[in-house]
A protein has these predicted regions:
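Surface-exposed, charge/polar-rich loops and edge strands
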Residues: 1-52, 59-221
Length: 221
């Protein structure tokens, strides 16, 4: 009797767990759909002139000013092919004397500190605003003395550059530039959450049906 109760508890625990995983995937599906819609709206929106109080993800903006290459930051990153390198994050001062962190794009690891990555034309830039994502537990600590960063901690960035920035990073859009290669922002994000949800729910139903079958079979025997 005791073993039967333990078995029943275990089966219903597994079913509940898998149902919870399915529900979590539906929550993630809603989040991903909202994200795709938000990015889509930003990509379709006309660019507006940058000002420091803009606090909207994926807002397309235009800014005019100058880069400060002396305080450039190298953020460890993989490109679309999985090759290791760096995102080049450069302070930019607008004509209104506001400071922005510009993600100018990706470079190979051996291009770090090379002069070729700092050749720019003109003072006007266009891009999308992204809210800075805080460091998660899986990322290593920044090696600030080597100017190798794994996450953007604004407190440390402010100390490193001697400037103050808000929590939004400007991602440069310029198809004419190849080094650094600007990140291409699209709405083509992987979205398999519905498939995963159906899988978890299907497993839960299968386990429940097998449980009923074997329980009925044991009663007959």
């Amino acid at each position: 009797m005791k073993h039967k109760l333990l078995f029943n508890f275990f089966v219903f625990f597994i079913i509940t767990l898998f149902c919870a995983l399915g529900t979590w995937q539906l929550v993630r599906l809603q989040w991903k759909n909202n994200l795709i819609n938000e990015i889509g709206e930003g990509l379709k929106s006309p660019a507006i002139n940058y000002y420091n109080k803009i606090q909207k993800n994926y807002q397309r903006v235009i800014a005019e000013g100058e880069y400060d290459f002396e305080k450039q930051i190298y953020l460890y990153s993989l490109n679309e092919k999985g090759e290791p390198g760096y995102d080049v994050i450069t302070p930019f001062k607008t004509l209104d004397l506001e400071n922005i962190l510009i993600n100018r794009g990706w470079i190979k690891a051996n291009q770090k500190n090379e002069s070729i990555i700092n050749k720019v034309e003109g003072k006007k830039i266009q891009g999308l605003m992204f809210k800075n994502v805080k460091k998660n537990i899986f990322k290593p600590d920044n090696e600030i003395e080597k100017n190798i960063w794994f996450s953007i901690n604004l407190e440390y960035v402010n100390k490193f550059t001697g400037k103050k920035f808000n929590e939004y990073i400007f991602y440069l859009e310029d198809e004419k530039i190849s080094t650094p290669k600007p990140k291409k922002i699209t709405i083509d994000l992987p979205n398999n959450h519905l498939k995963y949800a159906i899988t978890w729910y299907s497993i839960s139903i299968s386990i429940f049906l097998y449980f009923l079958y074997f329980r009925k079979k044991n009663e007959i025997l």
